């Protein structure tokens, strides 16, 4: 049997990189996919941007250089896990397109997933009120408000979370990754 490019190979890991604004649904989708893949017996790990920043990138700020360093660190860890057969789900804003391309180019079997929701939707979802504070100028360097978010131009999968449910998003992810729905 011949495998297609996006089908998982036995003993071969992959990296699924979820990118998008804060509140778009990256962690929600990645967590739901993690649960589904775990239930199917897939060796899978979730690297959440907030957890990595807290544990591996403590001390970094939110300058472009610091954000790029954080993304590169996440990519390094994801690559190590994937080389050992793990399916790695990365949930990180990763706002700069060039840095994402650079990191993804070093990873085995990368899939870029653009988790997309308009600013008004992510603002409504923001229970901490960070977007409102950023829009009022109280939080500097806030991605999507006072700092840029460079959306992928050609992601492998584009999920509009204001139009689909988490369950539908997971179905689309499973199908795209070759696991069936």
From Swiss-Prot:
The keyword Nucleotide-binding applies. One of its GO terms (cellular component) is cytoplasm. Gene3D superfamilies: P-loop containing nucleotide triphosphate hydrolases (3.40.50.300). It comes from the Bacteria. GO terms for biological process: hydrogen sulfide biosynthetic process; sulfate assimilation via adenylyl sulfate reduction; sulfate assimilation, phosphoadenylyl sulfate reduction by phosphoadenylyl-sulfate reductase (thioredoxin). Its EC number is 2.7.1.25. The keyword Cell membrane does not apply. The active site is at 94 (phosphoserine intermediate). InterPro entries: APS_kinase, P-loop_NTPase, Sulf_AdTrans/APS_kinase. It is an enzyme of class 2 (transferase). Belongs to the APS kinase family. This is Adenylyl-sulfate kinase. It comes from Deinococcus geothermalis (strain DSM 11300 / CIP 105573 / AG-3a).
